[in-house]
Amino acid sequence: MSDSGGFDSHPHVALIPSAGMGHLTPFLRLAASLVQHHCRVTLITTYPTVSLAETQHVSHFLSAYPQVTEKRFHLLPFDPNSANATDPFFLRWEAIRRSAHLLAPLLSPPLSALITDVTLISAVLPVTINLHLPNYVLFTASARMFSLTASFPAIVASKSTSSGSVEFDDDFIEIPGLPPIPLSSVPPAVMDSKSLFATSFLENGNSFVKSNGVLINSFDALEADTLVALNGRRVVAGLPPVYAVGPLLPCEFEKRDDPSTSLILKWLDDQPEGSVVYVSFGSRLALSMEQTKELGNGLLSSGCRFLWVVKGKTVDKEDEESLKNVLGHELMEKIKDQGLVVKNWVDQDKVLSHRAVGGFVSHGGWNSLVEAARHGVPVLVWPQFGDQKINAEAVESAGLGMWVRSWGWGTELRAKGDEIGLKIKDLMANDFLREQAKRIEEEARKAIGVGGSSERTFKELIDKWKCNNNTH
């Protein structure tokens, strides 16, 4: 993009993420892309963060991009006991939502647009509508999950009884213009109508039609049918444009040369090509001791080499247990000849791009699945909570991976070690999946390349925001 026209011709875009690395990571990658497209960028932050990883991530980002303006949003005092939730990330979302009416001073001088996290949109929209400021949503899961989120308020309204309760008679939820979603795949928290998550889920779902557009970290080859249905207004009438801007690329600031990364890469260098299964359940989830034991036994029984990232606590500030305490001495001893187990932060992009890695066992977090798609690594998804079954379905439909519906949610402990081992063996030996994953890798490369679908979408957005400069 040319620099002609002077600095004032460049759009000025602000971004407000919420809590959790799964939300923060795509926001910072999007912000970096906006900088590279010569936008002025403001990042609205809240402190303290829930996890130490979030604080470090923001700090590294701001050091790498000094041209980005940080504006700190000071939240009102918040009593966690006033909300029907215990999850620390849900509680932080609610704390930001309750302070959203105070955002206006941070949204000046005039901006071209604000990009708001999906968890905050219903609370932030009244502010931006009052300021006549275009407000876009960054949806941090799959387009398939967005189809449920956007249509869910109407579905709930149609299922409500005279007493105010919601009754689902069927085993599936019908999504207009798309295949139905099994009721068993819907995030359990959404089904508890009294929970904080369910309330905000409905409020945010109702707000999409009032926004100016929805950005999703996906691309045409990964979710073509869903994206076509959404933009054809078949899912929800009056829905604004849905912009597939993925895969959002990792940035240099995310790559840290620390001893654990060097150890991992050296170990991978010594393994045959495509022989290692990488196992990671993301930044938020700590498996139960029982799950950890079954997964460890499954990895051993698979006979495959493996790199396993183990997490002990939900919030990293509390995670002080040693690997031996988490896994137990006996399992640690069995593992050491077949795999490498680490508890530190892992540069997932470097791992997935390594020639030795031939498969990925994942919880189904969308950022991880898109990274697997970008590197052409087939995935075995073991969903644990939230949107992850729906993400797993999207990955399976695209041909990138597999998931075992009978395992249910990971916390239900339906999967035993022997069965896990067999599925890992299937994953690593599946030539068809490997070919499909490589095809998707090539499509991902094309999408963000010159003239690719995501690159064109990005330019379309920036042109819209340039026009907004003339009206502010």
From Swiss-Prot:
Expressed in leaves and flowers, and at lower levels in immature fruits. Optimum pH is 8.0-11.0. The active site is at H23 (proton acceptor), D117 (charge relay). InterPro entries: UDP-glycosyltransf_plant, UDP_glucos_trans, UDP_glycos_trans_CS. UDP-glucose-dependent glucosyltransferase catalyzing the C-glucosylation of 2-hydroxyflavanones (2-hydroxynaringenin and 2-hydroxypinocembrin) and phloretin. No activity with flavanones, flavones or flavonols. Exhibits C-glucosylation activity toward 2-phenyl-2',4',6'-trihydroxyacetophenone. Can use UDP-xylose as sugar donor, but catalytic efficiency is much lower toward UDP-xylose than toward UDP-glucose. This is UDP-glycosyltransferase 708G1. An anthocyanidin binds at H23, G386. It catalyses: a 3'-hydro-2'-hydroxy-beta-oxodihydrochalcone + UDP-alpha-D-glucose = a 3'-(beta-D-glucopyranosyl)-2'-hydroxy-beta-oxodihydrochalcone + UDP + H(+). It is an enzyme of class 2 (transferase). The gene is UGT708G1. SUPFAM superfamilies: UDP-Glycosyltransferase/glycogen phosphorylase (SSF53756). Pfam families: UDPGT. UDP-alpha-D-glucose binds at T140, V346, Q348, H363, W366, N367, S368, E371, D387, Q388. Belongs to the UDP-glycosyltransferase family. Its EC number is 2.4.1.360. Optimum temperature is 50 degrees Celsius. The keyword Zinc does not apply. Keywords: Glycosyltransferase, Transferase. It comes from Citrus japonica. GO terms for molecular function: 2-hydroxyflavanone C-glucosyltransferase activity; UDP-glucosyltransferase activity. Residues 283-284 are annotated as: UDP.
